[in-house]
Amino acid sequence: MAPTEEISLQVVKKRAVRGIATLTGRTFILQIISLAAFALLGGLLTPEQMGVYFLAFAIKNFFAYFADIGLAAALIQKRGEVTEKELRTTFTVQQGQVIILLAIMVVATPLFKSWYGFSDTSIHFIWALGASLLFSSLRTIPSTLMERELKFGRFVIPQIVDALIFYTLSVTLVFLNFGITSFTIAVIVSSLVSLMLTYVLYPWIPGIAFSKDSLKRLLNFGLPYQVNTFLAVAKDDGMTLVLGGILGPAGIGYIVWAKKWADLPLRFAMDPVNKVTFPAFSRMQNNISELSSAVNKSILYICSLVFPAVIGLIIIAGPIIETIPSYKKWEPALIALALVGFNTVWAAVSTPLTNFLNATGRISVT
């Protein structure tokens, strides 16, 4: 099937069910890899080193927000066929944005050093994350087409390989006392491999083009969609960046360590469902009864898993920290874990509803 060809409702439903199963499996694999690595790194790294790790990724995520004006989401959400002109316009605009942002990131290096007290090693890690942002933007179109067509069997492979390479290299090099440089090496290698693998799985010939009309049509949905996500970026990564300058890397290490564990139920239960339901809901826009049923089922499924998982996590966190000697240093983060847990419960209800409104084009409501 051509990348721009529309698919029927029956195909959408079948691929959506398979997609949820595939992405749930992907999430399970990724979280197992991430958990194993995070557990090992929690014992090997100091809170300050962990803080540098989180702050660097927060900087990268903040820049990544401005590298996207919602064009990929607009391609997924669009009713009807997607044209090659729209694909190439999206590709061209995004590459231009990323190059400008990378230049700003380099210019802002003295600010990162003074505000966070970063060493040269930490700065090199941030630059490596900037390079990974470029590699990620280069694979946006084939990834978007796989997602639009609900071909999640292919879609998940580069993500799993990326995570496996990154965490394996990170843990190995940290164990060998490479410190923060471990992450610099790991992120470059993993992002390059995932870029090449994406184009192997979904060949698409990159090209430079610009259509004002195509860009305008996509921005009608994409820009409000991206503005809508700014609250999430400001709440998570923005807050990390502000608090990092006030509390220092060690203080932010405690807070974000707690948040990562508290958000774990969302990553397992909610993320795979939302990833599939966004394009699926978009394809169901003309069938209200099917759409309503799908929304209700997705919320019920997510809440039935997230609610008990969060409560259980808060209860057992203290005893686990007491049991593992190398984790005693994370005891100050237990209060933050409980507080963030309540936010996780609310997100299990509100995020699927926001996803539904976005998928059906009611972006101004959200």
Please describe what each predicted stretch is:
Residues 13, 17, 80-83, 134-159, ...:
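Membrane-interface junctions at transmembrane-helix termini in multi-pass inner-membrane proteins
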Residues 35-49, 113-116, 172-174, 233-264, ...:
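Helix-terminus/linker motif at the lipid-water interface of multi-pass membrane proteins
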